[in-house]
């Protein structure tokens, strides 16, 4: 019957989903390093720490995480900046403490990720909610899967 066929297909898809794609330990460590450094780590440093070339790290990271290491670091740095903006820190303070070259660098990153200004992001604290920004983050670190 169709119900049985759908049940078989559903069970097969569920098994595939639960197995999930595996993540290389080096990629997981690179991600952990990016998060621990709040996005303030150079891709060259990550490559040295993993023992891979910059090109191999870039390729494996992108295929397994879905972002390049540089883009992931920018996103993590932005996330911390958004938290600080939502907490009421000025854009100048956030830029200085967040590793941005200057306030206009922060402005460009905020605009790039949100399409809004730092002032608008400060008024939208939902952008800085961890369980929205990083769903499954803890699971990723424990399971080694995104």
Task: Give the location of each predicted region.
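Histidine (H) residue identity feature
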Residues: 80-84, 105-107
């Amino acid at each position: 019957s169709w119900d049985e066929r759908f049940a078989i297909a559903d069970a097969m898809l569920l098994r595939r989903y639960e197995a999930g794609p595996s993540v290389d330990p080096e990629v997981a460590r690179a991600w952990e390093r990016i998060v621990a450094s709040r996005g303030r780590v150079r891709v060259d440093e990550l490559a040295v720490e993993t023992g891979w070339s910059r090109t191999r790290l870039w390729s494996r990271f992108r295929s397994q995480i879905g972002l390049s290491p540089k883009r992931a670091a920018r996103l993590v740095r932005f996330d911390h900046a958004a938290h600080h903006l939502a907490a009421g820190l000025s854009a100048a303070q956030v830029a200085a403490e967040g590793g941005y070259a200057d306030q206009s660098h922060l402005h460009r990153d905020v605009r790039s990720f949100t399409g809004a200004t730092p002032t608008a992001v400060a008024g939208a604290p939902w952008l800085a909610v961890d369980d929205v920004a990083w769903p499954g983050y803890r699971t990723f670190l424990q399971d080694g899967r995104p």
